[in-house]
């Protein structure tokens, strides 16, 4: 039976990728359906109760700059906020917040339920309706069929999900939820390259059984940083401390003695786990020279006693988990509320995706989130927003869009995935971006909001505030350029008091701000250069843009040089074996990857600059040299 209404976009899955995808499609005016196996778990934090971090916080700010939800949701549910790398340069500073799980999920659901153009429906999806290699809908568990022009699949760890606790294992998408077995089987019948990955979660602890007097308190920042460009500190709920403890030699001895009971070390789990978030048994074996590992004790919320011990993810049996937990300082009498576990699941080789997240084999089908081999809420949200946007554009018959590597971490993410693929769960770091000085948290809106407005993602409120901020930046920079001081000026002693070396020639406010020892706030203490701008975001930009102007310009020059042929299109049906001069290896790799552009081709492993030159000559010779947008 077909549902009586047709949709423009169907999103399958209500996690962090699915919610952003559904909201993006709906915000751009498309009639959108979000199918989830359980409406009560929309926006649920399946693993750690936190948003942001190095590289990840940058993605959250970019999602926000394009009108996404994640930053707004954490501002309303964050119970501890911190700026990481605060003493370092702006390129690597990152915001991180602990979340109250219940508040976060409630906020996400409220936004989804009140979003125009968006319909929610609770049913697991068992199959996709595909005709002539084009998706036209989805089939639910009870046989109900939904038609749509495009479909976004955000299945998380649910496709063929298998949960492991010791030698016991059972089917599940996460603890308490069923896995998508039928859909996983159907997708395996398609021409996708599919493999297995694994992730894990630690046991949850009852705070009432912990001796906090033996733990090191870790307070948040004061004043608290804000995630959303439209957010403010008044939105933040009550703030609390996190705590720190450590594993010890006793902990490690327990783990070593029970490795034969670990499904990972016994060969039961074949999927590869996240390199940068390994299980405690993996850490103990890989870093055998370390006597202890730091464990962050994170509260799960304001109205629960559950604690999340970040750093002891494990799939060891429950009795061993209990020994591990109770071996740590402060946890001698700890009670485990929920056991830790590992989960193994299907993922699809992201090299089978276009830069828009559309699959190369099935027209109108988009993948986002852990299905693409990534790990983390933030990576999922970024993919979800882009996939939802491009599914919307596809349903309207418009050309897709994705940012380049030099424009956004979102661009780095899809470029890495679609050109290099991944053999392990991929997480974002600032080190993955070659142009990170230009890709800062603080300028995500300046990089993306204008484009978001053109694409229909940015509403009037955000657009108005953005334009106000841009205007305030320009006005304040010009004001500082116009104020001059010289060695004989009336305020010279006051000026020299904030300088390492006194002024010997005439200088503008901008000249002074360029000096490493001068901050915007210290400059504003001098009467001649005050008062400070009322717009704190604008004044932050004035300082960063002024201090780093030379470096930023140098990076822009590098970007322009590298972009010369970045968007030169490569025909999908180009027969590389007929391009004279290409080696057999290059022909095989290009034929397999079918890159969309010269830029993407150049980043495929083994594709040499000489091969790129040969391709360009071939394109020109046959009248195929076309520049993309």
Curated annotation (Swiss-Prot):
An annotated Gene Ontology molecular function: flavin adenine dinucleotide binding
GO BP annotations listed: tRNA methylation; tRNA wobble uridine modification
Residues in the signal sequence: none
PROSITE patterns linked to this entry: GIDA_1, GIDA_2
Name by which UniProt lists this protein: tRNA uridine 5-carboxymethylaminomethyl modification enzyme MnmG
Primary role: NAD-binding protein involved in the addition of a carboxymethylaminomethyl (cmnm) group at the wobble position (U34) of certain tRNAs, forming tRNA-cmnm(5)s(2)U34.
Keyword entries, A-Z: Cytoplasm, FAD, Flavoprotein, NAD, tRNA processing
Binding-site residues for NAD(+), renumbered to this chain: 273-287
Gene Ontology, cellular component aspect: cytosol
Co-factor requirement: FAD
Keyword NAD assigned: yes
NCBIfam families xrefs: mnmG_gidA (TIGR00136)
Family: Belongs to the MnmG family.
The keyword Repeat belongs to this UniProt entry's keyword annotation: no
Upper classification of the organism: Bacteria, Pseudomonadati, Pseudomonadota, Gammaproteobacteria, Vibrionales
